[in-house]
Design a protein with these regions (language model features):
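Short, glycine-biased loop/turn motifs at secondary-structure junctions and
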Residues: 1-160
Length: 160
């Protein structure tokens, strides 16, 4: 099964949230029993959902295409609206995605998935320009999350 995984760091030195180092093209395996949100190698079916596992608004992150090669357990976090999340005991780091890969992927997303991406990924001013105008709601998310316009979602009610 293919998916996406987020790491902290840069393309030359990246690790998971527990400090375990990874390299592109390598296969990793654990002998531990796997449990969602606890042990094993976690990944998501959709790139934007990997952002749940890293702080891409504040830290340098790497997103990789991965392939699960072992036992897989599916789970979801319905409370926060995350579905198609997985944990495996054996994973291959197929490819480090470039920034261009990530932005191209996001530009093709439907609005409801693009909202999550905009909320959780730090974008440069040049990248923001690529997303502005896609919809009025996306514009509001950009203003709120990237330009700290805290009033953008306030609704003005007119008195009778």
């Amino acid at each position: 099964m293919e998916g996406y995984k987020i790491f902290i760091g840069n393309k030359d030195n990246f690790e998971n949230n527990y400090g375990f180092q990874f390299e592109e093209g390598k296969i990793y395996e654990t002998d531990q029993e796997i449990f969602p949100k606890k042990t094993g190698f976690h990944f998501a079916k959709r790139l934007e959902d990997t952002l749940r596992y890293g702080n891409a608004r504040e830290e340098d992150v790497i997103i990789c295409k991965v392939t699960a090669l072992g036992k897989i357990i599916e789970y979801e976090d319905e409370y926060y609206g995350y579905y198609d999340l997985y944990v495996t005991d054996k994973i291959k780091i197929d490819k480090i995605l470039t920034r261009e890969d990530i932005i191209s992927y996001a530009l093709a997303l439907p609005e409801y998935r693009l909202e999550r991406f905009i909320q959780t990924m730090k974008l440069s001013d040049e990248e923001v320009k690529l997303f502005m105008g896609k919809s009025s709601l996306i514009d509001k998310y950009i203003l709120f999350y990237h330009y700290n316009d805290k009033n953008v979602f306030n609704t003005q009610y007119k008195g009778r």
